[in-house]
Amino acid sequence: ELSGTVETAFIGGWHRNAKYVELRADGIRRVMTERGLDAQDPDVCLYFSAHGTPISYLEEGSQYQEHVEESCRLIADAVAVDRYELGYQNHTNRTKVEWTEPSNQDLMPTLEADDVVVVPVSFVHEQSETLDELDLELRELVEQLGMGFHRVATPHDHPDMGAVLADLVIDALNASAGAPLAHVGASS
């Protein structure tokens, strides 16, 4: 049984953190170097895959799509890539829900590239939506289309990820110095 309260603070917009953007860019550069790919080659497509979200959430004020698009732009800029694509991993089994577009399944066949470097932009750790939906399902589609599939890992085990998260917390604490944080009480 828990009792008491916990002070909390919301840390938003951390996709803009320069160190976070750089470690995401580092992952892309690493894959491109290992695979002998050139980010400036027009036959190489930098492809961001984001978790889809219902349009109704966006209509209710969620900034998710804006943040994903901004994150892609910042990371692409850090890699010095002008051309990139963004597709969404939508839950196609939920047909009564309108999802963010374009879906990976719709966008991928339209690409004109020999190689696709896939970045799971809205994921910070590996899970079924990266390991299954990207590594198995999307890879199969990409290879059926005759393109090379190159997946960038999520940053969960990047040596700088812990420091990025610590900096975000420290910055939030410093910003709230003297200001009350929100209180979350445990129910008894």
Regions found by a protein language model. Give the residues of each.
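Extended amphipathic ligand-handling, pore-lining, and cofactor/metal-binding catalytic surfaces
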Residues: 1-188
